[in-house]
């Protein structure tokens, strides 16, 4: 038996159906407040209703910018990204700047950069200018600041 895929046309949901859509979206993925508002605006009749609904969901902790920031941060750290790349990813989610700074300040970026350097290039401190430049470019691309990069590539493992 073939089922017809029924799709609600855009810009006609309100009330309970809009709330159901919001819950359906949030069960699949964590959205920032602004992302959820933009997504729901596509289907809603009234923009003010969307804003009110998202504020209510946030107050009831169904939606949390804090959780979104933590998830993005842990994901980016697993990928070996530095503070600048992570800040950019968090800004793309349109999160509050204070929240972004709170999330980023507790991390030992020197240790992160050093571990990434060791994983890619080993523990040896390079004296060759070309190889040193390659390490610097690698860590810069990952989003680390130059002072941290220089400390990481000159660091000698103390055992």
From Swiss-Prot:
Subcellular location: Cytoplasm
GO annotations of cellular component type: cytoplasm
Keywords associated with the record: Cytoplasm
Any single Pfam family the record assigns to this protein: RecX_HTH2
GO biological process terms on file: regulation of DNA repair
InterPro entries per record: RecX_HTH_2nd (IPR053924), RecX_HTH_3rd (IPR053925), Regulatory_RecX (IPR003783), WH-like_DNA-bd_sf (IPR036388)
Superkingdom assignment: Bacteria
Role noted for this protein: Modulates RecA activity.
UniProt record similarity statement: Belongs to the RecX family.
Protein name (Swiss-Prot/TrEMBL): Regulatory protein RecX
Name of the encoding gene: recX
